[in-house]
Amino acid sequence: MLRYLLDTNIVIYVIKRRPPEVREVFNRQHGRMAISAITLAELAHGAEKSSDPPRNLAVIEDFCSRLEVLPYTAKAAMHFGSIRAALEARGTPIGPTIKPGDLHIAAHARSEGLTLVTNNLREFERVPGLLSENWL
């Protein structure tokens, strides 16, 4: 049963095996984690901009074979709208702290009832109703 949605920064730590502790937690949670299609898009973008796109895209494909990639759904989009409106109403709209991609990932996690695993807890604390934790 899925419990966690991994943020892009955590995926990068796992792939690079740094720090080692994050890889250990990742291995213990096998079958309970997924990534958002938004995270996959961010990873693919980074790989395409890298000095060795074919190799880095292959690494991403290998990583994605180990867990589920959740499609971004209409339900997630509705959560995005709700979260964005709530942040704007509080006078803390999307800006220097939460990037639009991050907000989509947060909305996706919240819409699926999953805990977002991120190294940016401070960014995501503003999102109402979002469960989050850091494995570092």
Where are these regions (language model features)?
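Alpha-helix capping/helix-boundary segments
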Residues: 10-11, 39, 76, 122-123
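Short, flexible helix/strand-to-coil boundary loops that buttress conserved ligand/catalytic motifs
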Residues: 15-18, 26, 47, 84, ...
